[in-house]
Every structure is written in structure tokens, then in C-alpha cells.
């Protein structure tokens, strides 16, 4: 557990690439998960639109709204003192006019109190990235598997398996960097491509299912701690604890103890003194 850390900045995050210090990022969606991430010493916390899947019960990220992202970012930022908080901009909030993009980002930053926003996409969203950075909004890019485009790309598939696709992704990465992004997430891309992009960029890359060559790594909180009792196996995920099983077992024990009248026991119960009891019910001797 790390204490008394200075708040991270975009400049510090970029310098970590130059210094060869791996960057750690994890998602968080509420006060308790953000507090645990902060106490663990995570560098960056992503309030991801993955909350649609793991918190709100949707089958994709597409239904998540700006109001959802603000609500959860506010909870996260209340817990964080030093980690750098990034908020996803939801589906179709940065694909219209630049004025609309700035409006949505302004709401997320002002109301959610995060420090940056994350956008999915390549060269086609470079104008949005440029408009945001020129307005003073730090931007994290996201390439490879982009969940908001999952239907367009044909499902959750590894990207960059052939040379043509790899070259296009590098072009996209350079375009996002040129537009002003200070960091880039690479999701589900081949190890070789991630290494190539990381070498070609001056900004840090953070991988999820992108091999060990990225400048940092990110995992979804629920995957990392095994929060789901029956998690969907993913090759690129490492589960460090199985919190879901412990939580389920604890709740099961609670249910059993209540039904068997074992809880609450004496140590969980508050008592009146005898004089107060006598006054409440009446003293039979009077």
C-alpha cells in the first residue's frame, strides 16, 4: 500500500515512458473500488464505459450515457487523491459536430471531476481529439479492438493479424498522437504490432490483451479481482484473487444464519439496562 503520493499529471505519465517505468491502470466505477485502487498505488484509474457490461448488466457498452459516466466518475473521484482519473466518452458522443463533442466533454470534466477523457477510434476521430486538446481537455486514445464498434468490426476479435491491418493501425496511432492525445490504449492487438506502435510513438501505450511490450497495462477491475462468481474466461486476463466466490459464500452464510436464527447473536445486539426495561414494561412489584 502506497501513501503520500503526489497526484499524477499528464507530464508525469508521459515521462514514465521515457524513464522506462511501467504504467499501471485499472478500471473503477464506484467509491469502494476506486479507494482500493488508490490504496494499492495504481497510477491511472479508468472509469470505463465497460460499466455497461460489468455494473449495469447490458450486453455491450453502447447503451451507456453521458449521465451514467458522470455519475460513476463523481463516485470515483471522491475516493482518489493521487491516481489520474480518465473517463470514457460514450458511444456517439464525439462523432457529430465538434461543438457537440466539446459540450459532452465539458459536462464530463466539470461534473465528473476527472482529469481526462478517452475516445475510441483512429484517424477519423483526430479532429475531435484536436478540438478537445486545444480546448484544454487531456485525451487518451484507444485503438485495436474498440468495443463501441464491436458490431462494425464483427465481434471481439484480435486486431492486427496481417500486415495491411497493422499498417493502418500504426497510421491511426500516429494520427491520434499528432492530434494531441497524451496516451494511447491498445486493446486486443498482436504482440508484434503493439511493440511496433509503442516504438514508433512518443506517447505512452497502455495495453489490454496487447502483450508485454506496451508502456503500461490495464485490466477491468472485475476481471482482476474475480468479482463475478462465474467469470467469462479471457486469455488476456489474469485474475489475482477470487473475490466473487468469497462474497457469494459470505452472503450464503448470512442467509443460512438468519434462517437458523444464529444471527444476530448476543455480540451483535444492543441492550437496555434493567431499570429502563422495568420502566418500559412496568414493574410487577408496583
Q: Where are the regions a protein language model picked out?
A:
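Alpha/beta enzyme core
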Residues: 2-274, 278-286
